[in-house]
Amino acid sequence: MLTIDAVGTPVFSDAIDIANARIRFANGCVVNATASRVSLRMERKMRIFEDDAYLSLDLQQKILTLIRKREGSGTPGQLPVQIEEQRLEQGDALKAEIEAFLECIRTGRPPTVSGEDGLAALETAMRITEQVNESLAARRLTEAGLDV
C-alpha cells in the first residue's frame, strides 16, 4: 500500500455520519470506499474498473453487472458495450467463513486469506479510522477558531 487519505464528518449527530477513504496501492490500484449513515437508500456496492470492462457488484441485491467493451463501432450514439447481469447465490457469509476455517483445520490446507493478510487488512482499517478521527478533530479546532 502506498497512501491512505481518509476523512469523516458528522452530519446529523455528534458522531461521524459519513466517511470516505482513498487507498492507493504500489501497483497503481486505487480504492475509494465510503461509509454513510445519511444516505437516502441502503446500499452495499463494489465497483471494479478494468481497461475494457466495468463490474458493479450489488451486495445488497446480490446482482453482478458486467459491462464489457465490444469490438466494432456499434450503433451511432450508443457505446459499443455488452451488458451481462447475473444473480448471485444467496448465502451466509459468516457460516461460509467458519466452514472454510474448519476445513483448513481438518485438511491442513492453508486458508484463503492468510493471517498476515488479515493483519494487514486490520492495520489498514485502523489507519483509516485514525485519519477519520484526526480529520474530525481538525475540523472542530478550525470551527473553534484555532489553527490546526
Regions found by a protein language model. Give the residues of each.
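Short secondary-structure transition/capping segments
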Residues: I16-D17, K69, A125-M126
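Short glycine/proline- and charge-enriched loop/turn segments
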Residues: P76-E84
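Contiguous beta-strand/loop segments that form the cofactor/metal-binding neighborhood of enzyme cores
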Residues: M1-K62, G91, K95-R109, A144-V148
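A short glycine-threonine-serine/GTX helix/turn-capping micro-motif
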Residues: I83-D92
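Residue-level detector of alpha-helical recognition elements and their boundaries
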Residues: A19, E43, I63, R70, ...
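C-terminal helix-rich "cap/oligomerization" subdomain common to oxidoreductases
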Residues: A26, A100-V148
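Short active-site-adjacent structural elements
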Residues: L57, L66, A121-L122
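Short polybasic amphipathic segments
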Residues: M46-I48, K62-P76
